[in-house]
Structure formats: structure tokens, C-alpha cells
A protein has these predicted regions:
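Conserved SAM-binding motif I beta-strand of class I
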Residues: 95-100
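Mobile active-site "lid"/loop adjacent to the S-adenosyl-L-methionine
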Residues: 117-119, 132-181, 188-192
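Glycine-rich helix-loop-beta junction characteristic of Rossmann-like nucleotide cofactor-binding loops
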Residues: 62-68, 172
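Conserved SAM-binding loop of SAM-dependent methyltransferases across substrates and taxa
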Residues: 80-91
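Conserved S-adenosyl-L-methionine
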Residues: 202-212
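Conserved class I S-adenosyl-L-methionine
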Residues: 70-79
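S-adenosyl-L-methionine
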Residues: 104-134
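SAM/dcSAM-binding transferase cores
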Residues: 28-43, 51, 62-64, 214-274
Length: 274
């Protein structure tokens, strides 16, 4: 599937460069204006959180209480650190560990540490277990996202790819009675991914926090208790993918890129989490 996805991305890049959508050159500036007037963006600035996504995690935890009693929390794709801040405030003692390809500026929280690296790298995974003193995580959470292309079909597949990657990693690093929180889009692969989650976990919930933008296709899947007889999707852990995804992070923005919450197609616009 990845070879197909990689080809699709390359074709889309060429189409966008040769035929940019009408008005697309203004999309980033429009998004920035809307973002800066948005309630949770301004609230994060006032309250000292690094991103508006902090409030999504707060709202999810208010509902599910996954931080209650947690001592080891792993945040995948943790930059810029908004989820690390919330987790660090929410657990007593223990350790919150964030992993990202980019270096995360110091949060000055005693129970929060970070690792620069790719969590799919076995050496990084061993480093995580070492930091957790040989124990697995009580909570694994992933708000991972790549710069969007502005092309729904491509962005949907890329986001599901990240979610499946997080699921594979969670299988190795989460305690059997632990929690997983992961972001997905309500797109073509959404239902298939939910089936995969249910094959992995005994309890699976689909939630859209109030802090998510109204026009966003994103939802969060919250799951608890790994099944003893679980099955996981195809492992997406090849060395080639490590390199190609790292390279994608360094690409020059395309017209319409960096719009993480554009409106979804109409068939998904009225769809509610189930």
C-alpha cells in the first residue's frame, strides 16, 4: 500500500505545481487569519500552552480519565509539546516521554522528557523502555500529523498511515491494561481502521472534542485494554519508509499546504462519530 501512496503523493505534487488551484496562493494567509481569531488558539496563548491541541487532550481526559493513576505516558510525534504539557500536569510523579523527529524546546517540567528520533527505530524503542525503567507505558497517545497537501484523498491516506504506524508501535510499548489515543480523519479508510482498532483493543471509542475545529474531518480514537489474541495491521516499519517520511517533513510548502483543518468533502461533513 505504501508504494501506491508514495506514487499518489508524487503525482499530486506534480499536478499542484503545474496546475495550482484557483485562489490557492491565498489559502495559507486565510487560514492564519482564521486561526489567530479562533477561541482555543487565543486561549492557549493566554494560558501558556504551546498549541490549541492541548485543549483537545484535556477534554478527552475529562471524559475518559486515562491519566488517572498513570505513571508512564508516551507521546508520539510530540512537537511542539502541547500534549506533553497537559500530560505532565495531569499525572502525579512518573514520567511523560515525548518522541519526535524535531527537537522540542524545553518545557521546564520535572516529569517531562523528550527524545529526538523516529519511534519506528528499534533503538529508539529500546531507549523508551530504558527511560521507563523496563516497564511499558500506561498511556500511548498520538496527535501525529504531516503537512497536508490540500488534496483530500491523499491527506486521508497519509493520516491513516500514521495512525496505523502508531497502532503497530503501541502493540509493542503499551501495557495490556493501558490506554491509546490517536487522531484520524473520517475518510475512506476510517471504518477499516476502526475495525483494526477493535481487533487490537477490548474497548474502542470515537470522539470529536469541542476544541476540534468545526469544519475539521479529524476525530480521536480512544481505546483501552489490549486483547490477548489481538491482531495488528501490516507492520509499516521498513528502513525505506523511515527515510522517505523524514524527507517529507523537509519539503517546501505547496500551494494550499499547511491547512491542517480544511473542510472535508460533503459526504463526510455531516458524518458524526459513531
Amino acid at each position: 500500500m505504501y508504494q501506491f501512496l508514495n506514487l499518489l503523493v508524487k503525482v499530486t505534487i506534480r499536478l499542484l505545481k503545474d496546475n495550482p488551484a484557483k485562489g490557492s496562493e491565498n489559502m495559507p494567509s486565510r487560514w492564519l487569519h482564521e486561526r489567530k481569531t479562533e477561541h482555543y488558539y487565543n486561549k492557549a496563548k493566554v494560558e501558556g500552552y504551546r498549541s490549541r491541541a492541548s485543549y483537545k487532550l484535556k477534554q478527552l481526559n475529562d471524559e475518559f480519565k486515562f491519566f488517572d493513576g498513570a505513571k508512564r505516558v508516551l507521546d508520539l510525534g510530540a512537537a511542539p509539546g502541547g500534549w506533553l504539557q497537559v500530560a505532565g500536569e495531569s499525572i502525579e510523579g512518573g514520567l511523560v516521554l515525548g518522541v519526535d523527529l524535531k527537537e522540542i524546546d524545553d518545557l521546564y517540567m520535572e516529569n517531562v522528557e523528550t527524545i529526538v528520533g523516529d519511534v519506528r527505530d528499534p533503538a529508539v524503542q529500546e531507549g523508551i523502555l530504558t527511560r521507563f525503567q523496563g516497564e511499558k507505558a500506561d498511556v500511548v497517545m498520538s496527535d501525529m500529523a504531516q503537512n497536508v497537501m490540500g488534496v483530500w484523498e491523499v491527506d486521508d491516506l497519509r493520516q491513516i498511515h500514521l495512525a496505523r504506524m502508531a497502532l503497530s508501535i503501541t502493540d509493542r510499548l503499551l501495557k495490556e491494561d493501558g490506554w491509546m489515543i490517536v487522531k484520524v480523519f473520517q475518510g475512506k479508510e476510517h471504518e477499516a481502521f476502526i475495525r483494526e482498532m477493535r481487533a487490537m483493543f477490548e474497548q474502542v471509542f470515537i470522539v470529536k472534542p469541542l476544541a476540534s475545529r468545526k469544519g475539521s474531518a479529524e476525530v480521536y480514537v480512544v481505546a483501552k485494554n489490549l486483547r490477548k489474541d489481538r491482531t495488528i495491521p501490516e507492520d509499516l516499519n521498513s528502513e525505506g519508509e523511515l527515510q522517505s517520511f523524514a524527507e517529507e517533513q523537509e519539503k517546501e510548502p505547496l500551494p494550499g499546504e499547511n491547512l491542517p483543518d480544511y473542510g472535508e468533502p460533503e459526504e463526510y461533513g455531516k458524518k458524526k462519530p459513531s
